[in-house]
């Protein structure tokens, strides 16, 4: 979900023209891509996702995405204003010829920004709650992952109202994460495990921890992918191991790693060879036979791989409490095994 404004013009502006204009008008920006087709930049120390200026046949497209920071939205409005000034041409909302933007700074004001924040949280809460999946979004420097554990950590309910202060704290945390990771090394690779069906989009991306020449490969944080792989390149008899990213927390030494968001982890101490080998052993018990298998979400019906109906329990409307459920399970096992 994003907001897009198109500037219809035949004028050719190099990126440095409007970037310089913004800087001369007091904007302290950091540019991560300074060439078309997509120029990307954000406000120093304040951006989460930054904004994009894309070159199109009809002129320019300025885009800001959901879950952006207040500074991102403000820079979006100022960039639209700058392009209108520099080209002398008209701007339209979402490529709609009937919705002309005449005063972008007034149109995209503080009230509009607040509505964007509220919409971002409402939509992500609903998606996470209904799908049971995490959401990955690209940031100015790195991806960030939203999910139930992250929201719970900031006292943000997936189903009810939430305090705006808690939402602001989460946005501040994501902003700090972007600028922390800007100069850090992650575990990203270009490795993709192809799908048995041959579908390109069904291939699985891999984040990798490696041992080579007696040393653990350098990395500062474990970055999100479909799978985490661990490989000892010094020992050909030890097969590499791959596990779904949702299982990663189960194998990490807690005194060495701390969560960055829902799925990614910052290394805060030394990772030794022994630690990596221990992580590999734990991971082998979690590696699925079929890496491409996706379990059915509770409430979504029959899981063909498990030959099981996966049901959903909502404690908010159930007459059975979690404590009762735990007691019943323990009692059932005690009776069964005795």
Predicted features along the sequence, with ranges:
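Short, intrinsically disordered low-complexity segments
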Residues: 20-72, 218, 228-231, 243, ...
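Short, extreme N-terminal segment that most often corresponds to the first beta-strand
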Residues: 1-38, 122-163, 281, 288-303, ...
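Short amphipathic alpha-helical segments
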Residues: 14, 71-79, 322-325, 329
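Hydrophobic, Leu/Ile/Phe/Ala-enriched alpha-helical segments that form helix-helix packing faces
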Residues: 21-29, 79-87, 330-337
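Internal, hydrophobic cores of structured domains that mediate oligomerization or house catalytic pockets
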Residues: 27, 34-41, 47-48, 54-163
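Aromatic/basic-lined ligand-recognition segments
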Residues: 106-249, 254-257
